[in-house]
Amino acid sequence: MKEDRVINVFYHDRLVGTLAMTNERKAAFEYADEWLENGFSISPFSLPLEKKVCVPVKEYFNGLWGVFADSLPDAWGQLLLDRMLKEKGHNIDNVSMLDRLAIVGESGMGALTYRPEWDMPKQEKLSSLDELSEQCQKILNTEYSDKLDELYRLGGTSGGARPKIMTKIDGEDWIIKFPAHVDGKNAGLMEYRYSQCAKQCGIDMEETRLFPSDICDGYFGTKRFDRKNDSFGEHRIHMLTAAALLELDFRQPNMDYHQLMKLTKILTRDNKHDIENMYRRMCFNVFAHNRDDHSKNFTFIYDENNDGWRLSPAYDLTYSTTYYGEHTTTVDGNGRNPGIKELTAVGTAAGMEKDICTKIAYDIEKCVKNELDGN
């Protein structure tokens, strides 16, 4: 593959700026002059709206700033992409990060797009969910799948580790997940039940569904929060994970909920609803045993109507463990067995009243026990 040394970044067809590969294989970024006049900072802490060339200093994102790394697929999508590139005769060692952004092109998560775009397979027919799930297992367990192009088209630019596709249902954009090889056949049902419980706990989530299957208990699906339909058609929403905002390696346990609450407070300009919702998510993750609460599982979305940021709807809420037996994000320094004491300490430090923090924590603990324990 011919390496793209320069690539342009767009937001709703407006030129945001340019990425260029340095000799040190880092992607330097510079805002376009017009964007500096009437745009916004696409990454408030890392890329202020200033006329200068910004070169990444951390190595977590393979020479990219976090905001652009958010556009790239995670484990599942990267596996699909690498398999497909090999199948088409490319040496993936020669594929740069700018090449990968060009491959993402218009199809990535969020609102940022990249040009020139690398042409990807286009296929109109959608196989059944059961067939796609079986093809996912082939990819995970072997080097072969006769649906590779279709699976990449449907899920090759998605985030997360589990197999998934991105598709339209009744004109709306959805993500549908399939079990990974380490999951049981009830993985979809479990995540669906977790989503319903989370909503009962007052946590903001998009619409979720359990799609039927003949080979497992069903496939979990959720409507995408980075796509909205309005009177002008489909609208893409700019989003940033906490990992990208803080330039953190999400694979390492390097964050505490104190940081997440502070981040929410600063970024949303002290939006009380969002601060409380982040607190509720922390409580839910603790009581529902969701320990895979890393920094890419918390996202903020840009509200262009109000020129500000909001906490996104929650996602990836399900039973999970870590190899080290603790939460990836600690709670007041405690990752192994945090409880009411640690939860309220985080909430009060963020400016919430202690009585409210305590009540929310106990209410969520009770709801989780009633809805999820023993199942």
Predicted ranges, named:
Residues M1-S295, T299-N375:
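Phosphate/dinucleotide-binding and metal-coordinating scaffold of catalytic cores
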